[in-house]
């Protein structure tokens, strides 16, 4: 395999492992994959997530909150993780699937999308609107696949090409690990 980077430098590899979402995998590797893979009917769903840090708010003794809301699906309290020792409150906010679908192509240019998620979080929790010292939004156009495929991963020995990712098995992080582990076993 020969990979050309943005700076036009070329690098050669004996094997290639792709961990990209299905629509991108299909474009990159369709000539090297079996039709039973490229003909899969995979529907990838979008996701919009905001990271926000509030200054000096009381420590909140919960790890996450699930909302019954049209915009905000859940919030994770990053301070509840033992690896963090912080005097600021760190939160990860995740939009609903419906709202993510509606805003995925606009979030990079429309700051109101990030601000709406943050204000919704404040309204739904009743937390004080303390000074926000950090906020960042990111969206994944191809974030989730809720339907399992017949495969956990793919290894094409002829081309030394491997493919793995959470979308093979489901929407969770553990599905990505299961897929990668399965591919590692196939490679040997």
Explain the meaning of each model-derived region:
Residues 1-11:
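Conserved beta-strand-loop-beta-strand element in the redox core of flavoprotein oxidoreductases
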Residues 10-63, 127:
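Central helical "cap/lid" subdomain
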Residues 17-19, 52, 93, 135, ...:
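Generic structural signal for small/hydrophobic residues in well-ordered secondary structure
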Residues 22-25, 57, 80-82, 96-100, ...:
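Short, solvent-exposed loop/turn segments at secondary-structure junctions
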Residues 60-93, 101-103:
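Anionic-ligand binding region
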Residues 81-86, 134-163, 167-169:
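FAD-binding beta-loop-beta segment adjacent to the flavin cofactor pocket
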Residues 85-91, 95-141:
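Flavin-binding catalytic cores
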Residues 156-188:
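Conserved mid-domain beta->alpha element of the FAD-binding
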């Amino acid at each position: 395999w020969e990979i050309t980077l943005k700076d036009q430098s070329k690098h050669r590899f004996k094997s290639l492992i792709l961990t990209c979402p299905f629509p991108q995998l299909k474009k990159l590797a369709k000539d090297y994959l079996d039709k039973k893979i490229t003909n899969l009917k995979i529907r990838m769903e979008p996701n919009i997530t905001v990271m926000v840090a509030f200054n000096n708010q009381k420590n909140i003794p919960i790890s996450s909150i699930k909302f019954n809301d049209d915009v905000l699906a859940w919030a994770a309290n990053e301070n509840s993780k033992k690896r963090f020792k912080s005097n600021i409150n760190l939160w990860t906010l995740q939009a609903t699937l419906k709202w993510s679908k509606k805003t995925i192509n606009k979030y990079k240019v429309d700051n109101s999308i990030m601000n709406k998620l943050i204000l919704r979080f404040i309204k739904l929790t009743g937390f004080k609107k303390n000074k926000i010292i950090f906020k960042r939004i990111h969206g994944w156009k191809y974030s989730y696949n809720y339907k399992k495929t017949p495969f956990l991963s793919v290894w094409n020995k002829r081309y030394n090409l491997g493919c793995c990712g959470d979308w093979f098995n489901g929407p969770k992080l553990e599905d990505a690990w299961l897929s990668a582990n399965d591919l590692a076993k196939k490679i040997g």
